[in-house]
Amino acid sequence: MANETLKAGFDKYMAGVEAKLAKNPERANLEPNRLYTPLDIEGFDYEKDLGFPGEYPYTRGVQPTMYRGRFWTMRMYAGFSTAEESNKRYRYLLANGGSGLSCAFDLPTQIGYDSTDPMAEGEVGKVGVAIDSLADMEILFDQISLDQVSTSMTINAPASVLLCMYIAVAEKQGVSADKLRGTIQNDILKEYAARGTYIFPPKPSMRLITNIFEYCSKNVPLWNTISISGYHIREAGSTASQEIAFTIADGIAYVEAAIKAGMNVDDFAGRLSFFWNCLL
C-alpha cells in the first residue's frame, strides 16, 4: 500500500516537471531516471547486489577501508630533457610530499628510437625523459631507493624493455624484483585505436604483453602489469559510453589472450589496472 501511494505521488510529481526537464536534454546518450525512489529497488538483495566493502561485487570499494586505511599514492606525472634533469625533479617531488613516481618518456623512447636516430630529431626530451640505455635508467633513479617507492611508467610498445631496465637498476641497488611496486601502462590496443605509439603488429604485441603478465606473476608479484586506458580514447573524441565500452573490450581481449597462452586467470587478473576519463 505504501508503494502504491508513493507511485501515485511520483507520477504526479513527474507530470509537473516534464516541461522543465525537456529544456535540458541528456548529452550522454543515456536515459537515466530523473528521480530515484524505493520503487527502483524492489527485490533488491543486499548481499548480492550491494555487498560489503572490499568484497564482491565491489560496489563499495575494493578494500574494506579504502583511503581511510591507506591513503592513495601521491605522484606527479614528470619527466623531461635528460635523465639527470628528471632525476633532480623526482627527488624534489619525493622530498616535498610525493609518495610515488610517475615517469613520462619522450616520443622517441615511446616508439623505440634511440635519441641519435634521424627520426628522433626535434623530439628528444620534449614530452618526457629520453632513455636510450641502462645507464640512463640508472641515472634516472640515482639516490632513489626502489624498495621505498612505487613507480608508474607511462610506456606501451617498449614496456617490456623499460621494465627490464627498472628491475636491473633495482638489482644493482640490492633490491630483489619481488619487492618492487609500480605499474607499466603496457596497453597497446588503445595505441592502435587512439594514440599511435605502437611499434609491432597486434599479434606479436599481444604476445609481449601476455609474457609480461606471466613473468611478473612469478617474479614481480607486486607490480601492476598493465593500465588498461580509456582516458586516451575519450581524449581522441569518444563519448563516455564509448570510452567504457572500448576499454572493457580491450581488457577482455588481454584476459582472453593470456588464458589462450596457458595462464590461469587468478594468477594475473589481480594486477590488471584501469585508467579512466569518464569518472572525472
Across the structure, where does each feature detected by a protein language model lie?
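Catalytic alpha/beta active-site cores
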Residues: 1-279
